């Protein structure tokens, strides 16, 4: 875990997210407390539990982005889920324990990627040797196996390879050509593992019992392989990945993945206000309280069985978020409310915020669109009054219709640049376009003035 101070964390988040200092401070403190906890004696570490955070604010103000950027910052296992996807145990749908199972899978992918980077040089060397053997195959001698069961798994005929001095000489010549990149575009045939499921998805996507059956069958039967025609460049990548997989210790990777989930895992529970049932609820609201009660043990700490082993959730940091337009945080069951002691209210965006969102972040909307059009040789320049006008229009449309926060800017900028994006490929090279207030008013004038139109178009 990176040892960032709360101030450094907020400064990093400022590069991507405008405003919302209270929310940034809350997550920065939660992150620093994790590092502080890691320095405590082992007995004390178990006692210090994370203080989960509840973010309250309208859509498009930065709730999800804060959590996502924070996880990237510390390279922690991070999972974003919508609370509305889950149903009470006994109903059709995903059960809440799949949160932990998915988090372990994400963590394992991260750990394996890191470990594969460590063995990249050895894997590349082994892949190069396999490439040479594919381009200059040795003499093969069939070795008929006496084991009848091997025929079931297409392994009845193992082939031994004999490398003669002539073949070795040819491979040396090919090796030099491979290093020079002369054969990168040549098409060859390679054997790759078949990633198709062994069983059809007869219970529906995401159903846990189906996933468990797939894993069980995968463990019983050997992996099927099939032949693919690819370029040497692509074959090198495929073979390097396969060789790296062989070099890493799978059990060690699993242990490290589980440790990271237990000690550094982060879960972002979005739309939590949608499962906050009102008193006397009926119909579709019936199972909402059940989902809350199912989430409760995971948030307060329990042991979940996964295919990689048991995972304790006591020290996973949960960040819940919701607009709470209809329901209130007090509509959540009291036990769940108590598990989110830190409440942060995110402010709605002002005109000044919109101006900053358009220009300040590292990958702001204006920079993105300018870079896209620059690929066609079109230089787009936005004047200051154009930025002011875009911010003003976004604020007005949000005020008069649904408030969707910063996402409104995507719709407006897309509308402003629609004609230019369409004609860009036909314009001459080094063409410069200046976007000013008049240009924006010309493109959006009638739509902004007519509320009925802006409801449907912006």
From Swiss-Prot:
What Gene3D superfamilies does this protein's entry cite?
1.10.8.60, DNA helicase RuvA subunit, C-terminal domain (1.10.8.10), P-loop containing nucleotide triphosphate hydrolases (3.40.50.300)
Q: Listed GO cellular component terms?
A: HslUV protease complex
Which residues span the membrane?
none
The primary site where this protein sits is cytoplasm
Question: Is ATP-binding given among the entry's keywords?
Answer: yes
Q: Which GO terms describe its molecular function?
A: ATP binding; ATP hydrolysis activity; peptidase activity; proteasome-activating activity
Where does the record place it? Cytoplasm
Question: Which SMART domains does this UniProt record tie to the protein?
Answer: AAA (SM00382), ClpB_D2-small (SM01086)
UniProt xrefs under HAMAP family: HslU
Q: NCBIfam families under this entry?
A: hslU, PRK05201.1
Tell me which family the UniProt entry assigns to this protein. Belongs to the ClpX chaperone family. HslU subfamily.
Which named protein is this? ATP-dependent protease ATPase subunit HslU
Name the species this protein comes from.
Desulfitobacterium hafniense (strain DSM 10664 / DCB-2)
């Amino acid at each position: 875990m990176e040892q960032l101070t709360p101030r450094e964390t907020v400064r990093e988040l400022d590069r991507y997210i405008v405003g919302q200092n209270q929310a940034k401070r809350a997550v920065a403190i939660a992150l620093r407390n994790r590092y502080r906890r890691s320095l405590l004696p082992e007995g004390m570490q178990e006692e210090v539990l994370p203080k989960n955070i509840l973010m309250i604010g309208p859509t498009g103000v930065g709730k999800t982005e804060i959590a996502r950027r924070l996880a990237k910052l510390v390279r922690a296992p991070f999972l974003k889920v919508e609370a509305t996807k889950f149903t009470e145990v006994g109903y059709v749908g995903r059960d809440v324990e799949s949160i932990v199972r998915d988090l372990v899978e994400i963590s394992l992918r991260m750990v394996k990627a890191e470990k594969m980077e460590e063995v990249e040089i050895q894997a590349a060397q082994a892949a190069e040797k396999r490439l040479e053997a594919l381009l200059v195959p040795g003499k093969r001698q069939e070795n008929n196996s006496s084991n009848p069961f091997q025929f079931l798994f297409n392994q009845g005929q193992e082939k031994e390879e004999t490398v003669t001095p002539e073949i070795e000489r040819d491979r040396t010549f090919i090796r030099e050509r491979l290093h020079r990149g002369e054969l990168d575009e040549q098409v060859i045939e390679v054997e790759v593992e078949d990633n198709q499921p062994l069983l059809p998805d007869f219970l529906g996507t995401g159903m846990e019992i189906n996933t468990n059956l797939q894993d069980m069958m995968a463990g019983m039967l050997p992996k099927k392989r099939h032949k693919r025609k690819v370029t040497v460049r692509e074959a090198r990548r495929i073979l390097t990945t396969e060789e790296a997989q062989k070099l890493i210790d799978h059990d060690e990777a699993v242990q490290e993945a589980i440790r990271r989930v237990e000690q550094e895992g982060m879960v972002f529970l979005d739309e939590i206000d949608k499962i906050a049932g009102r008193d006397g609820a009926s119909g579709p609201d019936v199972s909402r309280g059940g989902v809350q009660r199912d989430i409760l043990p995971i948030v307060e700490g329990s042991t979940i069985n996964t295919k990689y082993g048991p995972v304790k959730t006591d020290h996973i940091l949960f960040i819940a978020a919701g607009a709470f337009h209809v329901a209130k945080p007090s509509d959540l069951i009291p036990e769940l409310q108590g598990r989110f002691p830190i409440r942060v209210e995110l402010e709605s965006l002002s005109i000044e915020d919109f101006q900053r969102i358009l220009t300040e972040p590292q990958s702001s909307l204006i920079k993105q669109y300018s870079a896209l059009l620059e690929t066609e040789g079109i230089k787009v320049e936005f004047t200051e009054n154009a930025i002011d006008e875009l911010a003003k229009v976004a604020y007005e449309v949000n005020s008069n219709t649904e408030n969707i926060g910063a996402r409104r800017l995507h719709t407006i900028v897309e509308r402003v640049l629609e004609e230019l994006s369409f004609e860009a490929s036909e314009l001459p090279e080094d063409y410069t376009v200046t976007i000013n207030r008049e240009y924006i008013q010309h493109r959006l004038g009638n739509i902004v003035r007519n509320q009925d139109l802006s409801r449907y178009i912006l």
